[in-house]
């Protein structure tokens, strides 16, 4: 099963058009520990039945067939429930949907294939490879026997102290739930891509030459930081619908050396902090740290390059700038705030020419005459066409650049009236240089300015909650002005909101399948009660590891519930059979728990072993898969 299932899964992925990417392969790696569950239960029961009928003279094939039929229903329903819990993940939207839908598809395909193999290939292989025991009895290893003895002592104590057991379980659950407010919430853990993008924003009115000079100095400073391998940068970006940039902006890509070559004890955050310190010497510069892939994804999905973006909407640019400055000051006071960036909308100088209508009237001119002259002198006007073979080029006439950039030269432009009288432009107009907006940003037709801030050493949810509270309490917005919250926070709100709908539906679907299996509300409710206590280990695991309650962690809880239900189905199905055979409740529970201890322990152990590598992995994408592994492993420890 473990060999054929991945191969058949790859074939199915190819037919369904699912690419082999970080998340789909991660889903297959997660499924490695789950795809043998059905086979473990089948082989375990076959071995047990062969021992019982060792001296009966019945053929081995018939005994194995009966053993498979005995566990077929609970195995099919159990693995089917695990597949079911992943199906709602396929409905996730946005960035989280792009990431976790391939994972869910891959796991569902792998488990479906493993289920078919466990019901067909595994029994056949068992007849050839499984040597029947010489007699019925205890065939456990020393380790399993020792574990079983300890478990039975605990089980007998629990059955003899039912009230204490229930109270302890409820208290443990309540105390664990009490830690939830301290976990913090986040969208998706930041992946370490091996490169850094220190986005640099200079004053808007800077010249291209000066911007290039400053960028070269910035790259020289960045290369002095330990752990930096190379730095490549470009200034500005062509006008495009995706992400235009002016000559005052740049997004250099800084490649980092392997971790073994970093200073001892340094992390990527330490390298980024060192870059910030180096770049502080550059005047008038805003620096926002990001990573190449996440930077582009954030820009495309949310329109901003920060963890949190506060969008201020209104009509007056000066008022927008004032409100944004107030929000920026509030954000700076919060613990964990870094890379504050307020969108620069001012800083561009304009030449203002106010025409004196009475003065031009005395010369017999109108406003359009003066405007035409200015358009020709400064902007240029097509005066003729130049032919070069079969090609034609417009010939534009305007003043030389040295005159166009000189206020005095423009003031001395002569205006000739219809009767031949001449006057300087300064005599018929008021000419002045004034500061104006460098850019005017709009969203859905409304003017806006963005305040962006990144969060360090703190969860996103609590930071935004505190910032919203302080902004609401300290800043009063004029009529017609309003705020919108975006960035990664927007993704987190959407994803967690979707999961709040998915999780209850998943639990309801599990309950429905359990009811179909047992045709009993009592047994279905009994197995469903495992879910809260399985969650205890997942929550404790997140709390101890310092991970936040994120989308991957939520996916981990969904996977955990499926595995916990499978183990519960295997155990309760056997106990139910013993009850129908006339055993008392206590005897049925003890015997069922004893005989099903090994398969339940094996399925849980194999699932945990398949996820342990994710705890210690440091490759790209491991940050996303680690919370999922922590939740499943921690939950299996408590629920098993």
Please provide the spans of the model-predicted regions.
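Solvent-exposed, membrane-proximal periplasmic/extracellular interface segments of envelope transport
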Residues: 209-304, 358-380, 387
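Extracytoplasmic/periplasmic
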Residues: 185-258, 272-277, 313-350, 439
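Hydrophobic transmembrane alpha-helices and their membrane-interface caps
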Residues: 1-48, 91, 109, 509-596, ...
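Helix-loop junctions and hydrophobic alpha-helical segments within the transmembrane domains
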Residues: 43, 49-77, 148, 496, ...
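Interfacial helix-loop-helix hairpins and adjacent transmembrane helices
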Residues: 51-65, 95-101, 120-173, 204-210, ...
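Extracytoplasmic/periplasmic membrane-proximal domains and adjacent transmembrane bundles
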Residues: 43, 57-58, 65, 288, ...
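Signature of alpha-helical transmembrane segments and their immediate interfacial
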Residues: 71, 139-189, 229, 281-286, ...
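Transmembrane helices with small-residue packing motifs
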Residues: 18, 89-99, 170-206, 261-263, ...
